[in-house]
Amino acid sequence: MITAALTIYTTSWCGYCLRLKTALTANRIAYDEVDIEHNRAAAEFVGSVNGGNRTVPTVKFADGSTLTNPSADEVKAKLVKIAG
């Protein structure tokens, strides 16, 4: 399993979030999940990195960078780049 500090900001009703989580699990990529509907600070963070929009899924990496609505392949490539 690829282990890295990876957080996915989601909502319970987001189909894109479910798709990404399923794909990451299938690729054995570990992640933490934060539902922005239940965490005001998380919702504010997501808005701050998405031009004021609370767009999910938003993924935050260990280096502080983010991707919005990425594919599992994009997440995997970013993790490889961060790992150097």
From Swiss-Prot:
Instruction: State the UniProt keywords alphabetically.
Output: Oxidoreductase
Q: What is its EC number?
A: 1.-.-.-
Which Pfam families does this one have? Glutaredoxin
Q: Which residues form the Glutaredoxin domain?
A: 1-84
Does the record carry Oxidoreductase as a key word? yes
Please give the superkingdom of this protein's source: Bacteria
Recorded hits in InterPro entries, A to Z, give: GlrX_actino, Glutaredoxin, Grx-like_ET, Thioredoxin-like_sf
Q: What molecular function terms (GO) are annotated for this protein?
A: electron transfer activity; oxidoreductase activity
GO BP annotations of the record are: cell redox homeostasis
Return the PROSITE patterns for the record. GLUTAREDOXIN_2 (PS51354)
Record keyword Oxidoreductase present: yes
Protein name, as recorded: Putative glutaredoxin Rv3198A
Species in which this protein is naturally found: Mycobacterium tuberculosis (strain ATCC 25618 / H37Rv)
What's the source species' lineage?
A: Bacteria, Bacillati, Actinomycetota, Actinomycetes, Mycobacteriales
